[in-house]
Amino acid sequence: MCTGVRFSDDEGNTYFGRNLDWSFSYGETILVTPRGYHYDTVFGAGGKAKPNAVIGVGVVMADRPMYFDCANEHGLAIAGLNFPGYASFVHEPVEGTENVATFEFPLWVARNFDSVDEVEEALRNVTLVSQIVPGQQESLLHWFIGDGKRSIVVEQMADGMHVHHDDVDVLTNQPTFDFHMENLRNYMCVSNEMAEPTSWGKASLTAWGAGVGMHGIPGDVSSPSRFVRVAYTNAHYPQQNDEAANVSRLFHTLGSVQMVDGMAKMGDGQFERTLFTSGYSSKTNTYYMNTYDDPAIRSYAMADYDMDSSELISVAR
């Protein structure tokens, strides 16, 4: 399971991050794909003549960078989140469309587009084709894509591709995005305000303290509950002005829905936990990351690497 969040500062800079929740690590690390790095897309999907530099969290499999989440120097970011039971992809390319393998979709987006507007326009003629990396299972995902202005959710299901405008700038897992947005209506009465004294009959009632207005916000770690909680937190967090404060906001917001070892078993009996939290700031083109066992937040600035290199860069944590 996973959670994603996006917001911007008063200068329009992107802050985008995610939790990756699972029972084991894939050996993920910070990967930098410079502008000069060349790779062939599986089905020949086109792109920029001069592609963007990309930084994010992922693994190298079959000699390819495969990103869980990533961003480019223009402030466009993308993350794949688990979506089993709903995600449905074709297994062969469709003639007359731009065919993109599911595992290369994050890199293809970040490498070739500068904004959500550009991505949304391109998706009108894109087919997402399921391709399984040798030794791995099919990835059943939906995607959260954001920039300094807005975010969208891309869900490929049996009835086709759905591109949703995400007005709360968060995403979790299944059910569908439409369900999550409808479910928010159950929580319209919650508030971050201090509850006013009231009377019931002859009894005068006062709040115990701060937080009473939040009564009803779910505390479990299921996908619908995390969506509600992170949407509430993202909507009510005070606007911040500088990089450090916004990175703190990003990690605290995602911390409100982190999964702790022992809280929730998966079907195989293993406990799910937040393996890592990652985030990106377009203000400084810096990726941030911490892990379950090392909560110190590490920073990885694009400026520290040769963004015109022809070599893929894997950064040891």
UniProtKB/Swiss-Prot annotation:
Tell me what induces its expression. Up-regulated in the presence of a mixture of unconjugated bile acids cholate (CA) and deoxycholate (DCA).
Offer one example of a GO biological process linked to this entry: lipid metabolic process
Report the family membership.
Answer: Belongs to the peptidase C59 family.
Q: Which Pfam families match?
A: CBAH
Q: Which residues form the active site?
A: C2 (nucleophile)
Matching InterPro entries = CBAH, CBAH/NAAA_C, Ntn_hydrolases_N, Peptidase_C59
The record's catalysed reaction(s) read: glycocholate + H2O = cholate + glycine; glycodeoxycholate + H2O = deoxycholate + glycine; chenodeoxycholate + glycine = glycochenodeoxycholate + H2O; cholate + taurine = taurocholate + H2O
Q: Under which EC number(s) is this enzyme classified?
A: 2.3.1.-, 3.5.1.74, 3.5.1.24, 3.5.1.-
Q: Which residues form the signal peptide?
A: none
Q: Which residues bind deoxycholate?
A: C2, R18
Task: Describe the protein's quaternary organization and the partners it interacts with.
Answer: Homotetramer. The tetramer consists of a dimer of dimers.
Under the heading Gene3D superfamilies, the entry gives: Penicillin V Acylase, Chain A (3.60.60.10)
Q: Identify the metabolic or biological route this protein is part of.
A: Lipid metabolism; bile acid biosynthesis
Functional description taken from the UniProt entry: Possesses dual functions in bile acid metabolism. Acts as a bile salt hydrolase that catalyzes the deconjugation of glycine- and taurine-linked bile salts, which occurs naturally in the intestines of humans, releasing amino acid residues and deconjugated bile salts (bile acids). Can hydrolyze the amide bond in all six major human conjugated bile salts, namely glycocholate (GCA), glycodeoxycholate (GDCA), glycochenodeoxycholate (GCDCA), taurocholate (TCA), taurodeoxycholate (TDCA) and taurochenodeoxycholate (TCDCA). Shows a slight preference for glycine-conjugated bile acids as substrates.
Keyword list, A-Z = Hydrolase, Lipid metabolism, Transferase
Superkingdom as given in the UniProt entry: Bacteria
This chain belongs to the protein called: Bile salt hydrolase/transferase
Q: Specify the effect of N173A.
A: Loss of both hydrolase and acyltransferase activities
Q: What is the effect of changing W22F?
A: Decrease in both hydrolase and acyltransferase activities
Annotated residues for binding of taurine: N82
Keyword Hydrolase part of the UniProt annotation? yes
Q: What is the effect of changing K265A?
A: Decrease in both hydrolase and acyltransferase activities
Question: What Gene Ontology molecular-function terms does this entry list?
Answer: hydrolase activity; transferase activity
Q: Please tell me, according to the UniProt entry, what happens when changing T3A.
A: Decrease in both hydrolase and acyltransferase activities
Q: What is the effect of changing R226A?
A: Loss of both hydrolase and acyltransferase activities
Outcome of swapping D268A: Decrease in both hydrolase and acyltransferase activities
